[in-house]
């Protein structure tokens, strides 16, 4: 991965992290402020012993703002709208494991969220980059069983879920919406997730 390209794409950018309570916003924000990612990420059973080159995320000088949880009351989306309007990049986090399990309550919540976000994106003069980030995949048995070289198939199956197809459509379609899946259960899992996100930022 080319760190120089990431620096050009993201340095000093304003980043909004949106999502309901319990999706991992605080964890991701903290990692983006203090963590680091390897120059090259290989999924391994055991941590790599070799001291490979690492990139310190604070070097990006990201201006990260995280949303508070909002209730179902539409008036509570005002804070999200403010964050959206000030952002160059938006990360919308959701519980991928619950959508895979067909949790209707979570489906209803993310549908409401994307109705709002999608409307803001459509009317935005300078459209921010938009990412749907599915977290808690470690709680899905199929994710745990999926070998690294078949991970693309896992993502494709997730994107094919009717609710995800709807969310992507509301966000502006497949050309405008990046979908990234992973886990933040461990430090290494979080590194892998952020690595995937950054790869899509510069692709």
Where are the model-predicted features located?
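Short, flexible boundary segments at extreme N-termini or domain junctions of P-loop NTPases and their
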Residues: 1-17
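ATP-binding Walker
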Residues: 23
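Walker A/P-loop
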Residues: 26
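Switch I (effector-binding) loop of TRAFAC-class P-loop GTPase G-domains
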Residues: 33-65, 75
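Inter-motif core of Ras-like GTPase G domains
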Residues: 77-103, 116-120
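Conserved beta-strand/loop subsegment of P-loop NTPase cores
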Residues: 89-92, 121-138, 170-181
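Amphipathic helical hotspot of TIR/SEFIR-family domains
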Residues: 102-130
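Canonical P-loop GTPase G-domain recognition
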Residues: 140-203
